[in-house]
């Protein structure tokens, strides 16, 4: 900042207006500061109090501000400019927008500022300008590195090896192509072509001729039946007609397995001991002779079953006495 533009030291109310804060907030801050200062005054030495009273004068305030400005201005002049920063060096070659021309007075001021600066700053500026990036320098550096690599013996061997490999890989394979072209590429044989080939085979012709000879031979005719054989066959057929075939024994229907526990408990699945083997044999004979079986209901007991079986084959002439004789003796 320039000395002329720098504002002088202001009192409390002027500082509040200069900063732009509200008066209420500024007054509260000033009151708190004055209260703290009054609390610290008894502990301050008399020399410091004298300096504090001198600080209220305008001449003292101006001298302090001038000293501050001179001290910081020297530091600002020693510092490097933003234009010489390394981050802006790469953009130095790019076209810039036309700016205002500098007058003679501006040039003199810049020269004076450079002369006032230390020689170290000039050296830094020269170094930063020398390290400017450009595509031309990058290409030249790469070419120089390649030349250095090629001059080394290991690099020469590697390039020679790569050259030989490329020559071998790029040679045309004429001989292999001729062999590949000589191989026929016809389709696979079909069923008709295989059959035609088999027909042309001489062995197949011999086998086919033998089969034809066997088929061409006349088959032997069956001998004519004699006069006695005719009558013998007729007698056999009459005997078979007189003795009819026995009717097939019908299979007993099995009781289907119960689906619930209660049916299994209250249903009779086996024959009780009351039926003797004699009665069972009689029952088989009657069923084979008659060819009809009576269906047994599930709710019948063994005693009812036995009686029902007998009633199924009783005639009108039978009596209760005859029925009782057929029962077992132990009843």
Swiss-Prot record:
Record region (Disordered): 90-127, 150-183, 206-331
GO molecular function annotation: microtubule binding
Subcellular location: Cytoplasm, Cytoskeleton; Cytoplasm, Cytoskeleton, Spindle
The keyword Cell membrane is annotated on this UniProt entry: no
Keyword ATP-binding: no
Biased composition (Basic and acidic residues): 154-165
Pfam families: Msap1 (PF17077)
TM region positions: none
GO biological process: cell division; chromosome segregation
Keywords: Cell cycle, Cell division, Chromosome partition, Cytoplasm, Cytoskeleton, Mitosis
Polar residues composition bias: residue spans: 267-280, 288-299
Superkingdom of the organism of origin: Eukaryota
One cellular-component annotation, GO: spindle
Free-text function comment from the UniProt entry: May have a role related to the spindle integrity, which is essential for proper chromosome segregation.
Homology family: Belongs to the SHE1 family.
Protein name in UniProt: Mitotic spindle-associated protein SHE1
